[in-house]
Amino acid sequence: MSEQIKTNGVTLILKKASVKNTIAMPDFIFDHKMYYNPAEFAWKYIGGTWKMPILWRLNKATLRYSELKKTLPHIKHKVLSSQLKELEESGLISKKIYAEVPPKTEYAITEKGKETIPVIEIIRNYGLKLMEEKGINVNLKK
């Protein structure tokens, strides 16, 4: 048995839990896509190979494109540009273009973006734990 609630363009499909005291993980539709839980929806914004490393670095400092690229040597320019654009569109980072020659562009984390840092840290620590369990040794840079 389920109940549908429409709010702000999002259709939530609430299913009655069969186990008492469970935390709701509702199905919902947003922007014509079905999501099966809120974690999947959050992953849309911070998931993938590069979004979390970009947010992590911008949390430490405001960086120009070239500075950010140097800290992520394996990312392709096209991918970095698209990831920055997606993060900016979702309000997690801001882009400031200075009217000078040569042109200067800086990227900074927003307050909304700073909300992701504790989540990223938990995921990072869990990943490190899994790596340790699998015998993967990594030289961590602070």
Model features per residue range: what roles?
Residues 30-79, 106:
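N-terminal helix-turn-helix DNA-binding core of bacterial DNA-binding proteins
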